[in-house]
């Protein structure tokens, strides 16, 4: 591939790429690791870790409660065009909790349909932090990046030389 398609600059082993939505894969790995360590269950209601979730109004009175597995599989019922957008790692978790506290709309009943959800994965990131007692970034770095030898994986790109940072394309 290309570091810069317009200038036809090829990618190299030194090229740096933004993680963007790939953080969802790392988040899922972290949740499964915490599950394997017995620190949480995929069947746990999300409200166990985010009490504000218990105040949400579902589409029907008999709708199932959102659990961690719903967030992992994007079947929580959140709309794709969600208010959180791409998870902003520099935003405090309090902003996410405030969003939940204000109420999240639903497009489906939990477990009854798939819709891509940044909000769901932001909530999982919060759960990783709460259960591990570490910041999300620190947990992922220490428990996933380092053991996998991902020594050139960065959260912030300010220190990366511009000629090594790939331009993202859709």
What are the roles of these predicted feature ranges?
Residues 42-59, 146-148:
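Short, glycine/proline-biased beta-turn/loop segments that scaffold the active-site neighborhood
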Residues 17-20, 114-116:
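Catalytic tyrosine of NAD(P)H-dependent dehydrogenase/reductases that use a Tyr as the general acid/base
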Residues 2-4, 14-15, 45-54, 85-88:
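Short linear capping/connector segments at secondary-structure termini
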Residues 1-19, 39, 93, 101-105:
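Short, conserved catalytic-motif segment at the N-terminal edge
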Residues 18-43, 121-129:
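Active-site SXXK
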Residues 30-35, 50, 72-79:
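Generic hydrophobic/packing signal
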Residues 2, 58-170:
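Short, surface-exposed loop or secondary-structure junction motifs
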């Amino acid at each position: 591939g290309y570091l810069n398609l317009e200038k036809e600059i090829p990618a190299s082993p030194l090229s740096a790429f933004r993680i963007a939505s790939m953080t969802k894969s790392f988040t899922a790995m972290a949740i499964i690791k915490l599950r394997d360590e017995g620190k949480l269950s995929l069947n746990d209601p999300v409200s166990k870790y985010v009490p504000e979730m218990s105040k949400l109004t579902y589409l029907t009175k008999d709708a199932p409660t959102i659990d961690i597995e719903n967030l992992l599989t994007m079947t929580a019922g959140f709309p794709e065009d969600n208010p959180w957008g791409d998870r902003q790692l520099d935003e405090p978790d309090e902003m996410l909790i405030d969003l939940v506290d204000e109420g999240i709309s639903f497009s489906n009943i939990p477990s009854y349909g798939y819709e891509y959800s940044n909000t769901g994965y932001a909530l999982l990131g919060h759960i990783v932090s709460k259960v591990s007692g570490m910041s999300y970034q620190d947990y992922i770095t220490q428990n996933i990046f380092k053991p996998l030898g991902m020594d050139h994986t960065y959260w912030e790109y300010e220190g990366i030389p511009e000629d090594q940072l790939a331009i993202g394309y859709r």
